[in-house]
């Protein structure tokens, strides 16, 4: 290999502001051109330290994300201005993949049987780091994962383009109902069997769940908020390779021969009947054990395990293979709109299900070491949110989020977005994302979890920092006061009375300047007891 000698320097104030959590670390610079630096990023680069006699003191791998951003996103018409993915043009289809550290990229095509039929080398634009392939319109509906033009008429339910979306004047007027697409109907016998647990359950206006929603709308409900509905990593979309409560013991044992029920229960018995046979009081461990034995093969998940961020979950479609999920998710949203509700989507950009070479890793295989947040000392991926954390401060991760949100808002008509662990991003990032979405949907509403994890020296999207931005944050003041139950105590105590004050403050919008007489008889601004908002929105 080759070596470049580095000299120790002081970071500029601008550089320190860009990476405040690195501002006090040693900094070095070398003499090489941007083209040479781009070639270094394609190699296995290592930083080594030598003593005066040339003896190696130590070596470490390098976190390259800041260098990648500097080389590929600081100019005009480079990576962060590029149109990525499959782009349909008048004459054909252009495939654009941002992979600046890749040495070569090929586009592989497959037939309906998932057998590779062709492989085409892609060309690199060295300015942007984008690899491109120009193909004809004959690529449409072929598989690389799948070429799909979301503007095609056969992917739209009848009336999709012209149906009316309800509006609300102020975000303070929103009444939001949280629901899980599968749970909404999967056990409901008034829903057609083929639609239970599916997007299309929302189109059956006569079903009990939809009648329930209609009644709520009559009484002021404005939003139906669906838990994550993009492609999940841990739900098997092929129902022949998964089980639910209507499946038999034999179905489970075909997938998991180690399950204890395989030797204990009738093979033809439904899993529901096996659960029903257990005494919940005398033998709760049996139900717990069966639940655990089903866990790897059942069809339920909340959805906080993102696999493909920009594709509807296939297990909610009547046909998981192909484009059916696109049309049926749209039909769900159209039906909810026509019932009088706006639709909010839970988005989970703060982590991925996997990284590295794991089978469910995606982003980290395209640009290794870029999309995730890394510990500055150990170099390991940070897992503060639960799993493999992403790094929204990296410019192309923010662009990925922006492109994704605009797609969900325009192509599926989601009217609001709820951000899981929103505080992992910066305040500025969230405001830029909101601006991009409002450019295509002016009354879209953002809200999310503003819990602070680790303070990294920049302005994170926390409850306090987001006050007054019109981006809402979850209120744990009233949540904890109610959940902990002290407000219902029959024994008077300072903690129970203080919890009641938190409820009162929350009912007034958790405003910082609202004057509340507390349980001690003292009137003061609620900022003294945890109020953080400057606007109830």
Q: What are these language model-derived features?
A:
Residues 5-90, 123, 128, 134-178, ...:
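The feature marks proteins involved in alpha-glucan
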Residues 91-96:
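Structural beta-strand segments of beta-rich domains
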Residues 98-105:
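Short proline/glycine-enriched turn/loop motifs at strand-loop junctions of beta-rich domains
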Residues 182-187, 191-200, 214-222, 227-412, ...:
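Substrate-binding/active-site clefts of carbohydrate-active enzymes
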Residues 416-422:
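Short catalytic-loop micro-motif centered on adjacent basic/acidic residues
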Residues 422-428:
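Acidic-and-aromatic substrate-binding clefts and catalytic sites of carbohydrate-active enzymes
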Residues 434-436, 440-537:
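Conserved alpha/beta catalytic core and glycan-binding cleft of carbohydrate-active enzymes
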């Amino acid at each position: 290999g080759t070596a470049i000698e580095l000299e120790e320097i002081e970071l500029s104030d601008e550089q320190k502001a860009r990476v405040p959590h690195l501002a006090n670390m040693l900094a070095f610079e070398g003499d090489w051109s941007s083209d040479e630096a781009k070639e270094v990023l394609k190699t296995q680069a290592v930083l080594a330290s030598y003593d005066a006699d040339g003896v190696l003191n130590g070596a470490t791998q390098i976190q390259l994300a800041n260098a990648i951003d500097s080389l590929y996103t600081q100019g005009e018409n480079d990576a962060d201005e590029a149109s990525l993915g499959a782009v349909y043009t008048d004459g054909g289809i252009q495939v654009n993949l941002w992979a600046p550290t890749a040495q070569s990229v090929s586009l592989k095509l497959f037939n309906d049987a998932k057998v590779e039929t062709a492989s085409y080398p892609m060309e690199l634009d060295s300015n942007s780091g984008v690899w491109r392939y120009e193909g004809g319109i004959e690529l449409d509906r072929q598989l690389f994962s799948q070429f799909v033009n979301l503007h095609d008429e056969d992917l739209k339910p009848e009336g999709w383009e012209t149906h009316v979306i309800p509006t609300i004047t102020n975000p303070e007027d929103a009444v939001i109902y949280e629901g899980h697409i599968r749970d909404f109907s999967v056990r409901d016998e008034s829903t057609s069997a083929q639609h239970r647990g599916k997007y299309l359950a929302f189109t059956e206006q006569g079903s009990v769940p939809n009648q329930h929603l209609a009644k709520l709308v009559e009484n002021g409900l404005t939003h139906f908020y669906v838990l994550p509905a993009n492609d999940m990593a841990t739900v098997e979309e092929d129902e022949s390779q998964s089980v639910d409560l209507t499946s038999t013991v034999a179905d489970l044992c075909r997938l998991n021969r180690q399950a204890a029920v395989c030797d204990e229960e009738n093979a033809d018995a439904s899993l529901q009947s096996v659960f029903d046979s257990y005494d919940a009081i005398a033998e709760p461990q049996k139900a717990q054990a069966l639940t655990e034995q089903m866990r790897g093969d059942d069809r339920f998940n909340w959805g906080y395990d993102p696999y493909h961020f920009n594709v509807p979950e296939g297990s909610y479609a009547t046909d998981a293979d192909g484009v059916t999920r696109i049309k049926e998710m749209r039909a769900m949203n159209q039906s909810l709109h026509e019932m009088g509700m706006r639709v909010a989507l839970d988005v989970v950009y703060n982590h991925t299900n996997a990284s590295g070479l794991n089978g469910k890793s995606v982003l980290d295989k395209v640009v290794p070491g870029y999309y995730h947040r890394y510990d500055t000392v150990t170099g390991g991926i940070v897992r503060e949110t639960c799993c493999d954390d992403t790094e929204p401060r990296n410019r192309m991760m923010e662009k990925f989020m922006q492109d994704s949100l605009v797609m969900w808002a325009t192509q599926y008509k989601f009217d609001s977005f709820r951000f899981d662990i929103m505080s992992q991003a910066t305040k500025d990032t969230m405001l830029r994302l909101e601006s991009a979405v409002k450019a295509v949907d002016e009354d879209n509403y953002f809200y999310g979890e503003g819990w602070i994890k680790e303070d990294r020296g920049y302005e994170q999207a926390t409850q306090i920092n987001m006050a007054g931005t019109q981006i809402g944050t979850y209120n744990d003041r009233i949540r904890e006061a109610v959940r902990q139950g002290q407000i219902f105590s029959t024994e008077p105590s300072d903690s129970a009375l203080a919890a009641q004050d938190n409820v009162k403050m929350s009912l007034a919008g958790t405003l910082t300047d609202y004057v509340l007489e507390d349980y001690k008889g003292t009137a003061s601004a609620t900022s003294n007891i945890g109020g953080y908002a400057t606007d109830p929105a």
